[in-house]
From Swiss-Prot:
Lineage: Viruses, Duplodnaviria, Heunggongvirae, Peploviricota, Herviviricetes
Protein source organism: Epstein-Barr virus (strain B95-8) (HHV-4)
Protein name per its UniProtKB record: Secreted protein BARF1
Role: Plays diverse functions in immunomodulation and oncogenicity, maybe by acting as a functional receptor for human CSF1. May inhibit interferon secretion from mononuclear cells. Exhibits oncogenic activity in vitro.
Gene3D superfamilies, per database record: Immunoglobulins
Subunit structure: Homohexamer. Interacts with human CSF1.
Cystine pairs: 146-201
GO molecular function: identical protein binding
Residues bearing carbohydrate: 95
Taxonomic superkingdom: Viruses
Length: 221
């Protein structure tokens, strides 16, 4: 019983508080786990997991007797290192799917300690505009599309002068998920002749904002 109580006290003193880490897409970051103990030999077993929905834990890799093994799907994007009593998971955030919660499990004999960290992967906003005329025979409408690519919350809208006749009309082009996991949002603006009025596309992603002004077939930044 005394041994059991001692292990519980050790467990309580060894669990470090979780941290939130933010990485831009493509950036390399490090998640850290620390065991507050006088000395840890190579016999400690350390495992890092990616947490999924519910109770799902997907093993990324493990280290035991200073031998490191990374599971096949995570090779090239994850690595494990150690410095004394501190254990590192190095993440190359190459995809938005690397966003989420991670768990480090440290086990020595019958004692087990866990620590959870959160990684937020973001992609800076990019804004693009292109135009296309309506088809033969009238060529009377110019459709201008504004696309914003970002993560986690891309948003796009057109700003137009008031009182313009005939008034331009906007239509949501939908949301598309890119290969890197980021999101692209597009809004089409239909401009009847004449096409010379200036319109402004505004793209946002949380605290980011970008503008593109479209005038007579030209986009000025």
């Amino acid at each position: 019983m005394a041994r059991f109580i001692a292990q519980l006290l050790l467990l309580a003193s060894c669990v470090a508080a979780g941290q939130a880490v933010t990485a831009f897409l493509g950036e390399r970051v490090t998640l850290t786990s620390y065991w507050r103990r006088v000395s840890l030999g190579p016999e400690i077993e350390v495992s890092w997991f990616k947490l999924g929905p519910g109770e799902e834990q997907v093993l990324i890799g493990r280290m035991h007797h200073d031998v490191i093994f990374i599971e096949w799907p995570f090779r090239g994007f994850f690595d494990i290192h150690r410095s004394a009593n501190t254990f590192f998971l190095v993440v190359t955030a190459a995809n938005i799917s690397h966003d989420g919660n991670y768990l480090c499990r440290m086990k020595l004999g019958e004692t087990e300690v866990t620590k959870q960290e959160h990684l937020s992967v973001v992609k800076p906003l990019t804004l693009s505009v292109h135009s296309e005329r309506s088809q033969f025979p009238d060529f009377s409408v110019l459709t201008v599309t504004c696309t914003v690519n970002a993560f986690p919350h891309p948003h796009v809208q057109w700003l137009m002068p008031e009182g313009v006749e005939p008034a331009p009309t906007a239509a949501n082009g939908g949301v598309m998920k890119e290969k890197d996991g980021s999101l692209s949002v597009a809004v089409d603006l239909s401009l009847p002749k004449p096409w010379h009025l200036p319109v402004t596309c505004v793209g946002k992603n949380d605290k980011e904002e970008a503008h593109g002004v479209y005038v007579s077939g030209y986009l000025s930044q």
